[in-house]
Amino acid sequence: LLEAHIEAFQNGNEHAALGDEIAELARRHAPHTQQTTSATYEVLVDPERARSGAWYEFFPRSARDDDQHATLDDAAERLPRIKEMGFDIVYLPPVHPIGETNRKGKDNAPTAGPNDPGSPWAIGGVLEDGSKGGHKSVHPRLGGIEAFDRFVDRAHELGLDVALDIAFQCSPDHPYVEEHPEWFYHRPDGSLRYAENPPKKYQDVHPINFETDEWPALWRELKSVFEHWIDHGVTTFRVDNPHTKPFAFWQWCLRELRTDTPELIVLSEAFTRPKTMHHLAKIGFNNSYTYFTWRNTPEELREYGESLFHTDAVEYFRPNFWPNTPDILHDELVHGGRAAHKSRFVLAATL
């Protein structure tokens, strides 16, 4: 057999050296004196919508045309239109009860008016029965958990996924504050520290101390927040400021969650140094916010695109391009009119 293949190759049949028979012959008689073996490694493949999903964000309490507070049932009526526009994932900012203590007003005003709902990211407030609810509760005025389940069911009927915001911080009215004060930072006088991002101050929010002496119990509880919503049909999440929490927590938490929920998709909202954004991708975040919003000229877009798609980052960092967010509206959109909005939408959808 070998001589026949040699003769065919010498007569100009180049394929003879590449045939299945000769390959099997070489494999069978190859020397094995230097052969080594290694462990079999598992390869995790991202869900399809982590690779190509289009996200649509809206506040469910604004889903009515009049001035009334909408419910999640009202919001569900908008889902067919979102599907028709071509989106795959509907992202809801926090739907939890909102704290009343130190509630903020419009434009981060230090006091709220009688009709101001407060910031949805000030998580933790009073439920209809007078008890306090937190990250595992739905705001009563949105319809409670029953309305949330109906919203998710309707989205799934249309082929849409629902994404929830995970913001690990608490209003002064959150049950964690009363039940686990050791999970928070304390001032010398014993009071709890509020969140700050100078020059901004967020008196309506207490940051969580991930390095508390009671960190094992804290970490397990925070992981259970994901598990709670997974049980309600949500496997896609947007994480608020993950770079301000320990990397070790995310690596452990996301690995544990994917043991039972491999279809998990987690978007990192981390506007920080590129190296930090890339590290979050390496430890388990499928997608990441980017600086697309601030790249507007052809030169800026070209340079930024090359840094994302023509470097080794393409192997592990999957960028999301958002034309705007609830708290970021670039001057190009403020003053550019409808044409600017359309062009940024097209760029975000096609780059």
Task: Identify the role of each PLM range.
Residues D240-P319, G336:
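Active-site-proximal helices and loops of the catalytic beta/alpha 8
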Residues S52-E57, S62-A70, I98-F151, E178-P216:
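Aromatic- and acidic-residue-enriched carbohydrate-binding clefts of CAZyme catalytic domains
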Residues R61, V95-P97, A167-S171, P242-T244, ...:
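Active-site beta-loop-alpha junctions enriched in small/polar residues
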Residues L2-I89, L127-E128:
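An acidic-aromatic substrate-binding cleft motif
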